[in-house]
């Protein structure tokens, strides 16, 4: 019987006299077909090293091991430690947001790794931000289950209401594919939201230097703080309005353009103009 079995999970929770913690977004996968589909989507092959965040009871962990992966699992809740320690993995009982990713440096001798996870929904954005800002050159792919609403924001295109600074941030680092939707019935307990799996292929090279990247994201975050306003006005706290308007003109963009209209490449071109003065 697999760890994605509802009966197995129920037995485990009964044995430890505990229940899922809503505060930690503990909604466990209890559908083996979905577990297998996530691992297939992740492109994991034997000898890959994989970072799994929030393994819980280990349904996804078990399938990753079966696929031949070396798994490093980061779990905040110590109640799962005894069960996870039965598996041939490296286990870290710590808040993933506080885990120093440079501790995984030793695995880079094996090549780039992968991230595969059913992410705790309340910390999805901080975790994804951490993965790419702290260790962008560690990963080949990132395959994660997230809230469907967040998934649609991540893969959004310019001009839509879902398009925003998170979209630009993640699309800067990776080519992203909305893989499939996951019903609430595939979890225990059932979440109040729909879920989806996204697959990110991390870019080999980035268009900005390490020093430029945080400055660029300051620009994009500032732009979307008032997304319905004219871009030249939203950026006036960073640059003179006249300078922004001149840059927009040189790029062939309207002076009254709003933040959600510009593509990632448009923002990169604007950034270079602003940096050049």
Swiss-Prot record:
It is found in: Cytoplasm. This is Ribosomal RNA small subunit methyltransferase A. InterPro entries: KsgA/Erm (IPR001737), rRNA_Ade_diMease-like_C (IPR023165), rRNA_Ade_Mease_Trfase_CS (IPR020596), rRNA_Ade_methylase_Trfase_N (IPR020598), rRNA_adenine_dimethylase (IPR011530), SAM-dependent_MTases_sf (IPR029063). Its main location: cytoplasm. It comes from the Bacteria. HAMAP family: 16SrRNA_methyltr_A. The keyword Methyltransferase applies. It is an enzyme of class 2 (transferase). Transmembrane segments: none annotated. Specifically dimethylates two adjacent adenosines (A1518 and A1519) in the loop of a conserved hairpin near the 3'-end of 16S rRNA in the 30S particle. May play a critical role in biogenesis of 30S subunits. The keyword rRNA processing applies. GO terms for molecular function: 16S rRNA (adenine(1518)-N(6)/adenine(1519)-N(6))-dimethyltransferase activity; RNA binding. Its EC number is 2.1.1.182. It comes from Chlamydia pneumoniae. It catalyses: adenosine(1518)/adenosine(1519) in 16S rRNA + 4 S-adenosyl-L-methionine = N(6)-dimethyladenosine(1518)/N(6)-dimethyladenosine(1519) in 16S rRNA + 4 S-adenosyl-L-homocysteine + 4 H(+). GO terms for cellular component: cytosol. Keywords: Cytoplasm, Methyltransferase, RNA-binding, rRNA processing, S-adenosyl-L-methionine, Transferase. S-adenosyl-L-methionine binds at residues 27, 29, 54, 75, 95, 118. Gene3D superfamilies: Ribosomal RNA adenine dimethylase-like, domain 2, Vaccinia Virus protein VP39. Belongs to the class I-like SAM-binding methyltransferase superfamily. rRNA adenine N(6)-methyltransferase family. RsmA subfamily. Pfam families: RrnaAD.
